[in-house]
């Protein structure tokens, strides 16, 4: 069966990236993805996919970090990390599995990594086409810096050199454009955008519910920016999964969330392929 050609975007999700990574695997199994885009934790998965890292290795990367507690390592300037990985861990994993010194221009497919230009208060889309000389490690460090404060441009020289010298600080890509779902709008091929499903509207936040409040912030930003919308030739896939902002997870939980994300995305496969068995999961 001929797989259709599409482009795929992966939203940020913090430690819930387990679900979205599973969803990305389901899409990749059913279509020929011509380009990957991502912001925040989604940028890490998108970059790995664009460089041909296998789904098994991506799953192992996420599982090893969350199961080991490395997500709570201290980051830049001893600021405790609250995101998926500490910045050093992200860089080391990308160097190991993609290659030390790899640049955006080396990706096998089109690639877009969303970061936030804090000096100008706007999103900045780093791409293989426009920023081939930017180091993959540094692009992902800037994009996945959620709750680590900011990333000084001086610490990611390939960004500072390739872009404007008046950019001093970068922030997490999810702060300004968490879904990066419109970067492929100019392409004639369909676009599939993966994001966590909205939470139950009946669940009320309570004072002191830190995980719930953290999960509500990006949803509010998405609403304000009007980024969740219907596209002329695309599909917004809401991945079923709960983000409780748990930064330490057992391998069994990571596997379960991966499988749930895979099956959630696979249910949409008839839209672009007509798969007879859309509930097949990567995890047995």
What are the language-model segments listed below?
Residues 38, 42:
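Gly/Ala-rich beta-loop-alpha elbow adjacent to hydrolase catalytic centers
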